[in-house]
Amino acid sequence: MCSSDLFAESLGMGTSMVVLMPQAAAGIGMEGSDGASGAAGADGTGRDGAGADGRGRGVPVLYLLHGLSDDCTIWERRTSIERYATEKGIAVVMPEVRRSFYADEAVGEKYWTFIAEELPELIARTFRISTAREDTFVAGLSMGGFGAFKLALNHPERFAAAASLSGVLDATSLDLSWTGTLGERVWAGNEIAGTEDDLLGLLAQADPAALPSLFLDCGTEDELLDHNRRFITAAEERGVELASRLRPGAHTWDFWDESIQDVLDWLPLQDR
């Protein structure tokens, strides 16, 4: 694990991220352990410097996004994501975006520019991670589910797959009164429909053949269930292939801990 504070040019300030690199060999307590720690270095290399997969090839990467009330450490604190990812041989990048809705805030910081442009370039320079589309994935929960599908729909050429867990998938219908000044800070009262934040609008105009694989998971007791139902309907109307699952569960970490394991199983990871 690498937990890092960094200066982001697009934000004009310092920010944080957590990066998990897969172990070069099975570690103690992992299935198939040979007794070696197998910990990867900060640049993703093993002890022989050959790269996390042992052959000098960059490893696949999952950008894993946090929700509105969380930060870049939440996935590690609430799930066993490091163990899950190590078993799959995939790197995980968890950036900090505060309560930005993965947007260039109207009154605030350019978090969309950071997440969509600066962060991937920074990761490619710093870690031994593949930049190939077929090795690049994104997922998130709640606000992070919105961010994951926003990246996938605005930049389908970059991602092989995207997953939303209990996602905020219809920002045009949000009642922002409960979030205080969030709506004014992020959107300044401007219309969301027809913008890069209008996921249903983007879906309606998308070329289904050009999109990454999409996965949606939401609990039937989740307050965002209607958002997810609307996205499923919009995908069906556009002929977009969507792996969707509405199952018993609420907006909880018990649900997401199970869900992220299913996402990792679903990802089209290449034989390495």
Model-derived regions, located:
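Non-catalytic cap/lid and distal C-terminal segments of serine-dependent acyl enzymes
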Residues: 1-272
